[in-house]
Amino acid sequence: MKHEMMNIKPRCITIFFLLFALLLGNYVVQASRPRSIENTVSLLPQVHLLNSRRRHMIGSTAPTCTYNECRGCRYKCRAEQVPVEGNDPINSAYHYRCVCHR
């Protein structure tokens, strides 16, 4: 009986330290990137304003403009969404066109 108790103690201690190490590791990982709710909430209106100023890109990435498409531009040239039908831009399909910017 006494021999069994001596066997159980090291096992319990080992399990205890293993769980403690896992919990401590989890705490350290989560604490390395602190996120407060107040900062996240205060950034939401700013993100919404930036997104509402321009239309969202169709697809995941905008195409890159070639040298020939930007040949006449003096400054910056980038791909933008342009409605196919200019009369009804909301219900129209969009395609990309390279536009010169100043």
Curated annotation (Swiss-Prot):
TM spans (from-to): none
Keywords annotated in UniProt: Apoplast, Developmental protein, Disulfide bond, Secreted, Signal
Tissue: Expressed in immature organs, including leaves, stems and flower buds, but not in roots, shoot apical meristem and petals. Detected in the mesophyll tissues but not in the epidermal tissues where stomata develop.
InterPro entries per record: Stomagen, Stomagen_C, Stomagen_C_sf
GO cellular component annotations of the record: apoplast
Documented effect of changing residue 77 to S: Incorrect disulfide bonds formation and loss of activity. Unstructured protein and loss of activity
Signal peptide residues on this chain, from the entry's feature table: 1-31
Disruption phenotype: Reduced stomatal densities in various organs.
GO function terms (MF aspect): protein kinase binding; receptor serine/threonine kinase binding; signaling receptor binding
Biological-process GO terms, alphabetical: cell-cell signaling; guard cell differentiation; positive regulation of stomatal complex development; regulation of stomatal complex development; stomatal complex development; stomatal complex patterning
Subunit structure and binding partners: Interacts with ERECTA and TMM.
Identification of the protein by name: EPIDERMAL PATTERNING FACTOR-like protein 9
